[in-house]
UniProtKB/Swiss-Prot annotation:
Organism, scientific name: Prochlorococcus marinus (strain MIT 9211)
Entry-linked PROSITE patterns: GIY_YIG, UVR, UVRC
Protein known as: UvrABC system protein C
Cellular compartments annotated: Cytoplasm
Superkingdom per UniProt: Bacteria
Length: 647
């Protein structure tokens, strides 16, 4: 049960709290706060552990924010780790938070999960590609970004792969010959080792210079190489280099934001704040050019602006792996313990990093520019929140709810004549898709099969699986009506946020009735608000009424439900198509003698498609892990039943 009893909090066990406080030294280090179940709630640092930890439990301390106050009421045990210095404590704290990700350490979130560009220098023939995931810091790979405009990033990479012969595939398409990319000069033939690794590295280093902002240096280098090739009368090679220079110039023709000090790389942070929203913009300037920008948005403001900037530095630079930390960071205001942050960042970078609050005109103007971008972003966020609030308030009136539905879940079923039946759960929080909470359901009911589809039964199964544990909580004595508060100190915050204020079903009265019955069987029919949205005429139905609700076509609440319904449909149909595609691949292989599910899985993992298996040689098939020459021969002959000798 997620309920905290009196003996499960240090606030109510004064003897244990006193013993813990007596053992904590007045030295720098990190402290780790855990609940009764040893779940890590919070990780912090201080130059004096004793005074910092004691401050959480002062009886007259009204300075704690509601979030931290909620956390303190759940603390049952405290651990500490001593360090030699404040900067070492900062480094340790960042690593611990990154590893454990405690619930109450979450401060900021990216307003999007921005992509990076990665060059895999750890490989003999490095690849270059766009990614949203990053490897460990000790890897040799290099990351550039993050980039706000992923479309522009894709176009840039596409152009560079046309200008420079680069590795195009993560693995070779053929074992004994090159692919089409080599024939059209898009790849130097790395799969067959037709170029030496050192020569390939030289080409890739030129591309890396572009993402480091050193385009002027690269153009100078290419210009010198072009002149050398011309003198050697290698006019074809000189023409290729000339085209590369022109392509680079076109690539950066639209880059208007530059600064006079074109030799320095720096990050510039600007912050805009109001009563309950904070926006931070981080601009990456490399050799005088803007090469990347990222935004942070934080709601439920509880910290001063300088502390927010401090937290942004901590979280951003500790969580980015192998992204270049610049030698200079410009801020609009000073932060606490600035010298320790400089030392910490210098250790991460491997050379000196300075944090500067600029006074000079050029740098100060740059900070003001970033600050103006943060102001604009803040207004955009507030306008969006205002729009979503109007929709939520209108939906509250349409459905006659007692409160505004902050978390709404949408459900849909997708199948093809009863095959590969799947369900989807999508979640909107404050009117915005929260994709981290989406869930997929593969329907397990034996009553649903090819030619015997039953959307009602499938929906009922999804609802039972989604709310089964809540039915158990209620049976164990949890009052679910208390969940409306969302801030109860007696409940685990992660459990609280999983409870919906409203669920919407894609369908009409029949689908709604099936869900009602499933909730009744769980004993939750009186605890969850439910509605359905029928595609025909966009009609809303609610339990206890046979008639549709009276709504206007473009009513804000209806528009919100339509977005939710369409998102649930999209998510369900994509999952169904993926399962159907995999099933079709498997069905084409299942008839081959001696090939079972395990070997099918190995074949598809190696070749990616049935078509690739059909085109493979017997030797290539035999190279698949788990297949012998005999099975490989059977598979090859299955797809190639007649072999003709060419005389």
């Amino acid at each position: 049960m997620p309920i905290i009893e009196s003996s499960q909090s240090l606030l109510l066990d004064k003897d244990k709290l006193k013993r813990i406080l007596l053992t904590i030294p007045s030295e720098p280090g990190c402290y780790l706060m855990r609940d009764k179940n040893e779940t890590l709630l919070y990780i912090g640092k201080s130059k004096s552990l004793k005074s910092r930890v004691r401050s959480y439990f002062n009886t007259n301390n009204t300075a704690l924010s509601p979030r931290i106050s909620l956390m303190v009421r759940q603390v049952y045990d405290i651990e500490f780790i001593l360090t030699d210095s404040d900067s070492e404590a900062l480094n340790l704290e960042s690593n611990l938070i990154k590893e454990h990700q405690p619930y109450f350490n979450i401060l900021l979130k990216d307003d999007k999960k921005y992509p990076y560009l990665c060059i895999t220098w750890s490989e003999e023939y490095p690849r270059i590609f766009i990614t949203r995931r990053r490897r460990l810091r000790n890897s040799e790979d290099r990351y550039y970004g993050p980039y706000v405009d992923v479309t522009l990033l894709r176009k840039t990479l596409f152009l560079l792969k046309k200008l420079f012969p680069l590795r195009q595939r993560p693995r070779a398409l053929y074992k004994d010959r090159t692919c089409l990319n080599y024939s059209i000069n898009r790849c130097p033939g790395v799969c067959q080792r037709l170029i030496e690794p050192d020569d390939y590295h030289k080409t890739l280093k030129k591309v890396a210079m572009i993402f480091e902002g050193r385009t002027d240096q690269l153009k100078d280098l290419l210009h010198k190489q072009m002149l050398i090739q011309s003198k050697l009368q290698e006019f074809e090679k000189a023409a290729i280099i000339r085209d590369q220079i022109k392509g680079i110039e076109q690539l950066y023709a639209a880059q208007k934001m530059t600064i006079p000090d074109s030799t320095v790389s720096r990050d510039v942070l600007g912050l805009s704040i109001d009563s309950n929203v904070c926006c931070v913009q981080l601009f990456q300037m490399r050799a005088g050019k803007l090469v990347g920008r990222i935004g942070f948005v934080y709601n439920s403001l509880e910290l001063r602006s300088e502390l927010i900037l401090q937290k942004v530095l901590e979280e951003y630079y500790s969580q980015i792996d192998n992204v270049t930390i610049p030698p200079e960071i410009l801020l609009q205001s000073s932060i606490p313990q600035q010298s320790y942050f400089e030392q910490w960042l210098s250790e991460l970078r491997g050379s000196q990093v300075k944090i500067v609050i600029p006074k000079r005109k050029e740098k100060a103007e740059l900070v003001k520019l970033v600050k103006r971008n943060a102001d604009i972003e803040l207004e955009r966020v507030k306008d969006g929140q205002s729009k979503h609030l109007i929709e939520l308030e209108d939906l509250t009136q349409v459905l006659d709810l007692a409160f505004v539905p902050r978390r709404i879940e949408g459900y849909d079923i997708s199948h093809l004549a009863g095959t590969e039946v799947v369900g989807s759960q999508v979640v909107f929080i404050e009117g915005i898709p929260a994709k981290q909470h989406y869930r997929k359901y593969a329907i397990k009911s034996s009553s649903i099969s090819s030619g015997h589809s039953d959307d009602y039964m499938a929906l009922a199964e999804v609802i039972r699986r989604r709310f089964r544990r809540w039915s158990k909580y209620k049976a164990d004595g949890l009052d679910l009506t208390e969940l409306r508060n969302k801030k109860l100190s007696s409940l685990d915050p992660l459990i609280i946020t999983d409870w919906p204020d409203l669920i919407m079903i894609d369908g009409g009265k029949g689908q709604l009735k099936a869900v009602e019955e499933a909730l009744r069987q769980l004993g939750l029919d009186s605890d969850i608000n439910v509605c359905s949205l029928a595609k025909r005429n966009e009609e809303i139905f609610v339990p206890g009424s046979y008639n549709k609700l009276d709504t206007e076509k473009n009513q804000p609440g209806l528009l919100l439900l339509r977005r939710l319904r369409d998102e649930a449909h999209r998510f369900a149909i994509n999952f169904h198509r993926k399962k159907r595609s995999l099933s079709m691949k498997r069905s084409q292989l299942i008839d081959i003698p001696g090939v079972g599910p395990r070997r099918i899985k190995s074949l598809l993992a190696h070749f990616k498609s049935v078509q690739a298996i059909q085109l493979a040689t017997e030797k290539e098939i035999a190279s698949v892990e788990g297949l012998g020459t005999e099975t490989a021969s059977i598979i090859f002959k299955y797809f190639n039943p007649i072999e003709r000798d060419i005389v």
